[in-house]
């Protein structure tokens, strides 16, 4: 049971990392655009 629980946690971390990898570039892009618009003012 403990082993199963452990693997499920690892799977969750793996999924979270994959999601982060997919979303991070989008967040970075947005932050850059927000910064440029701020400096323009």
Swiss-Prot record:
Species whose genome carries this gene: Saccharomyces cerevisiae (strain ATCC 204508 / S288c) (Baker's yeast)
Additional remark text: Completely overlaps BUD5.
Protein name (database record): Putative uncharacterized protein YCR038W-A
